[in-house]
């Protein structure tokens, strides 16, 4: 289930969604850089995000073989071309940001929730 929540989190980051709640795994995942995972646990931890872009967004999920895809569809917001998530780690801690680009230049950098891992 956590690979699905991590994939959805990555899509939400890249689509410009406002992250409301996100929890990392206690042990760092091998399938995503530290700081970019999302763990869910029924009754305890959840992944929540909100669309503040000012227009509706449709989320499409599907699988091809063993690969899960999450796609966000909506209007072009106009003020950015794409979003790149970046992360870095030191010891047990990890930090992440998303960088908004317009015409090849970073126009905005936003901190994402930090993480702490036991490994």
Stretch-by-stretch model annotation:
Residues 1-119:
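Well-ordered beta-sheet/strand-loop patches within structured domains
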